[in-house]
């Protein structure tokens, strides 16, 4: 076997459709575009969503949902599982977490969420707690201060 003897598998190469080359070619005359109308003409068709002059659906439907919140509450978020490396009876604040490298950016007041497990007792001072986080901190013997 040589490179000069190689050829593609039979049926793997499909011939390009040549339109407008006479009726006998199978795609002559109207070239597969039907008879008359906008879709048979040259050039691009209509834009997406165009309904022939009728008021399109995206303009008939009312604009109701997905308003942006004007004054969103942005929190610096930390999960309970991230606090397990801290020593017991430590006072946890946003400043202490930034000093420890657990939190890198100050996106607003601290909020503690309940993902993960906590085994050490900590005194956590934050702006907000989720219900699960509060339960896990108190179950480990710690306290929550808002």
Swiss-Prot record:
UniProt cross-references to InterPro entries, sorted A to Z: Ribosomal_uL15 (IPR030878), Ribosomal_uL15/eL18 (IPR021131), Ribosomal_uL15/eL18_sf (IPR036227), Ribosomal_uL15_bac-type (IPR005749), Ribosomal_uL15_CS (IPR001196)
Bias (Basic residues) ranges: 11-20
Keyword flag RNA-binding: yes
Molecular function, one GO term: rRNA binding
Stored Gene3D superfamilies: 3.100.10.10
Source organism superkingdom: Bacteria
Gene Ontology biological process terms from the UniProt entry: translation
Residue spans of biased composition, Gly residues class: 23-35
A Gene Ontology cellular-component term: cytosolic large ribosomal subunit
Keywords per UniProt: Ribonucleoprotein, Ribosomal protein, RNA-binding, rRNA-binding
Residue segments, region Disordered: 1-52
The keyword Ribonucleoprotein belongs to this UniProt entry's keyword annotation: yes
Subunit structure: Part of the 50S ribosomal subunit.
Functional summary from the UniProt entry: Binds to the 23S rRNA.
Similarity remark: Belongs to the universal ribosomal protein uL15 family.
Name of the featured protein: Large ribosomal subunit protein uL15
Native source species: Picosynechococcus sp. (strain ATCC 27264 / PCC 7002 / PR-6)
Gene name of the encoded protein: rplO
């Amino acid at each position: 076997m040589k490179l000069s003897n190689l050829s593609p598998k039979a049926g793997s190469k499909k011939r390009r459709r040549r339109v407008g080359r006479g009726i006998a070619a199978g795609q002559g005359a109207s070239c597969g575009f039907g008879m008359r109308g906008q879709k048979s003409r040259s050039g691009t068709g209509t834009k997406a969503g165009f309904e022939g002059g009728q008021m399109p659906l995206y303009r008939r439907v009312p604009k109701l949902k997905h308003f942006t919140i004007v004054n969103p509450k942005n929190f610096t978020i930390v999960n309970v599982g991230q606090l397990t490396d801290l020593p017991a009876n430590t006072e946890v604040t946003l400043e202490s977490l930034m000093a420890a490298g657990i939190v890198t950016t100050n996106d607003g007041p601290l909020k503690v969420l309940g993902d993960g497990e906590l085994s050490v007792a900590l005194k956590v001072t934050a702006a907000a707690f989720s219900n699960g986080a509060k339960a896990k901190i108190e179950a480990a013997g710690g306290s929550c201060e808002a």
